[in-house]
């Protein structure tokens, strides 16, 4: 068991490991939604569904949905609701989602939230949607995004500011030259932040009004963030 998962265990004396419904992780680009999803998947033993992964898979395969999504990504825009909903709907049909799942990066718009609420209400889930937002300061987000570098061979991710490779510009494992994703520039990040803030604010208010929203501090150790999310989910369930 990883140290961060142990931190979650130690942070909660008695927590149910069964989550029969969706948990939404919200947060700006670079806030750590993917990292936290990995911790919570191990803790609750439910799948992590990342719209980013779904989008990249469709774009890599060159599907019709992927080609349209690629155009939006290159412009730093959020992909249209209908495209994302279609990708998510297909994923939710998989058998591993029967006991619940963690959604990372979805819903980002009020339309997507309404669609998800409707789906949950009609699929027999006993618990309502729970939303938790990971908050990180803007300048810290910028450092996380623009400093990100990937190894094209093994996929290892570095950050030149916070987790640099031993040899500048090269992967520690493969020795390959590191690359920066086209959408990890400051200009694209600023455009994504504007789009995210404008579209996601209504989602936050939607779940806040329903009494099913919490915000946690995302600028601290991974295990502490995960423990805070677990505590928030338990509180919202009561």
Predicted regions and their residues:
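Glycine-rich phosphate-binding loop of ATP-dependent small-molecule kinases
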Residues: 1-238
């Amino acid at each position: 068991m990883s140290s961060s998962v142990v931190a979650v265990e130690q942070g909660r004396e008695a927590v149910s490991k069964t989550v029969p419904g969706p948990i939404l992780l919200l947060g700006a680009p670079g806030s750590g939604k993917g990292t936290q999803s990995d911790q919570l998947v191990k803790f609750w033993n439910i799948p992590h569904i990342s719209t980013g992964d779904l989008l990249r898979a469709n774009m890599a395969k060159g599907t019709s949905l992927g080609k349209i999504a690629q155009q939006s990504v290159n412009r730093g825009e959020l992909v249209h609701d209908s495209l994302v909903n279609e990708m998510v709907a297909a994923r939710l049909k998989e058998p591993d989602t029967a006991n619940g799942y963690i959604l990372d990066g979805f819903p980002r718009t009020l339309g997507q939230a309404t669609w998800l609420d409707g789906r949950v209400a009609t699929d027999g889930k006993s618990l309502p949607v729970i939303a938790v937002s990971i908050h990180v300061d803007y300048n810290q987000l910028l450092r996380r995004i623009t400093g990100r570098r990937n190894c094209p061979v093994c996929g290892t991710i570095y950050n030149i500011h916070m987790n640099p490779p031993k040899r500048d510009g090269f992967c520690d494992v493969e020795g390959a030259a590191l690359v920066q994703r086209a959408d990890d520039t400051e200009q694209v990040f600023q455009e994504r932040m504007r789009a995210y803030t404008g579209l996601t604010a209504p989602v936050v208010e939607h779940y806040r009004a329903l009494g099913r929203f919490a915000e946690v501090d995302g600028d601290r150790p991974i295990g502490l963030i995960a423990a805070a999310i677990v505590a928030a989910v338990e509180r919202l369930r009561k």
